[in-house]
């Protein structure tokens, strides 16, 4: 199984888009990318818009190599919608290019879902159903493809128990040599997702940490809970970990990584690149773009 990370916060955008290659089969997981419309009361910096364009090109490129697409939930950083979106770099044409003639394994659009995601799922499926090969509601199901298997978790909370953000599904892919879990927005904050991951005994876990960047959020509690849960997963499974997404929107994410029982990589580090947590440093990027002095822990010469 070959893993190709496509987009994430360590690569400059909101996403956890992933491509897996197993023989001649391509699996595209959560094919979406987006930017936070407001952070520090600021719109995205020029560097973020450029990173989004690069992420979009990657997702479009690898969608053409995929026969299977999985969608964990209906937030726009996890699927490409059928509308013109500046901060999603989306359009009907791009969506058609991604989903046409594909088999989709998706979070159930009507069960264990909040009102906002139900509306988004309806809008997405209204268009997707016209062009896809097949759609499977994947929650809690197992699929055998001969050379590999895919198993989806039941719907688990998007974050902590009782989260108003709804539910997501995780996916496990096993080709007989490696067992990988992609756990997008569990945020490492609920018991159901932790227990399902441990039960699956993955060799590699791709996941996002708690959203400790949110103002007014119970940051201390989320930090300690996320850390405790991930360390428990590491102890029980000895899995290699790729940790990215929400956590990387917090400038302090390196401290979280240092407190883990085992070294974790971001998507950028897996690709042997430097982390570019652009959203976390949006304030500084705006200053740099105005010609003012500001420090960021990554190279900015690539877009200036």
Curated annotation (Swiss-Prot):
InterPro entries linked: RibonucZ/Hydroxyglut_hydro, UPF0173_UPF0282_UlaG_hydrolase, UPF0282_hydrls
Family indicated by similarity: Belongs to the UPF0282 family.
NCBIfam families, per database record: PRK04286.1-6
The protein's name in its UniProt record: UPF0282 protein TSIB_1029
């Amino acid at each position: 199984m070959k893993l190709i990370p496509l987009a994430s916060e360590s690569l400059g955008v909101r996403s956890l888009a992933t491509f897996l290659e197993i023989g001649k089969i391509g699996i595209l997981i959560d094919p979406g990318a987006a930017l936070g419309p407001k952070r520090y009361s600021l719109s995205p910096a020029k560097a973020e818009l450029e990173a989004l364009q690069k992420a979009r090109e990657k997702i479009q490129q690898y969608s053409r190599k995929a026969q299977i697409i999985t969608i964990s939930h209906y937030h726009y950083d996890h699927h490409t919608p059928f509308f013109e979106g500046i901060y999603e770099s989306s359009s009907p044409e791009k969506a058609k290019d991604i989903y046409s003639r594909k088999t989709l394994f998706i979070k159930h659009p009507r069960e264990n879902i909040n009102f906002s995601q139900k509306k988004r799922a309806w809008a997405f499926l209204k268009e997707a159903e016209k062009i896809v090969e097949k759609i499977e509601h994947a929650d809690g199901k197992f699929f055998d493809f001969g050379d590999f298997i895919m198993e989806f978790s039941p719907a688990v909370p998007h974050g902590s128990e009782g989260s108003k953000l709804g539910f997501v599904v995780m996916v496990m892919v096993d080709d007989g040599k490696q067992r990988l879990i992609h756990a997008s927005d569990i945020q490492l904050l609920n018991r159901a997702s932790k227990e399902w991951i441990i039960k699956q005994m993955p060799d590699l876990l791709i996941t996002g940490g708690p959203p400790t960047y949110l103002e007014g959020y119970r940051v201390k509690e989320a930090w300690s809970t996320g850390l405790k849960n991930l360390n428990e997963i590491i102890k029980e499974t000895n899995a290699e970990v790729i940790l990215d997404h929400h956590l990387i929107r917090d400038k302090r994410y390196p401290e979280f990584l240092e407190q883990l029982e085992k070294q974790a990589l971001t998507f950028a580090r897996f690709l042997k690149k430097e982390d570019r947590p652009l959203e976390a440093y949006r304030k500084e990027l705006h200053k740099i773009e105005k010609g003012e002095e500001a420090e960021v822990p990554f190279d900015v010469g690539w877009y200036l």
